[in-house]
Amino acid sequence: DLVPLIMNADKTFSLDTLFDDVTQGREILATDLFFYDTNPAQMTGLKNDFIASARLDNLLSCVTALNSILEADTSVSSLLICNDHEEVGSASTSGAGGTFLKDILARITIDEGSKIRSISRSLLISTDNAHGVHPNYPKKHESRHGPILNKGPVIKFNANQRYATNSETAGYFKTLCQSAGIE
């Protein structure tokens, strides 16, 4: 990655000056500032069958899951959690390795027993995008485990349990795909 350049080295820079209209003279004590690619997503490829966009990996999963819950049967409780920091190991307080989900479940259930019963009746699915086989570099993938672009969903397994996938969730997902006519 390239570090973004925002000014020449011989210039002075002050966040307080930059944000004067927002801070109205108050001192900025700390910041969480990031550079983001703000270009809109683009269709690409000879048949416009590929999407190119920044941050597509996690946002696609989150938007798809949210739309699914909004269209789901409301007689059954559903919970969607979209964690931060998946790309850096999920070990932050707002990542999947943090306590956020456990804390929320404790707040929305009556007692520990009902929380445990709810979890035992639940199915946890983690979603992500898979890196498809690039036709020019097929040897970068295992020969029997390479996702083919635009050929349907992929089920990811990890021996270190980095995904929520197990035989039960994989079987359930395959059954859902078959019933929806998805290969």
PLM regions and their residue ranges:
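N-terminal hydrophobic/helix-forming segments and targeting peptides
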Residues: 1-183
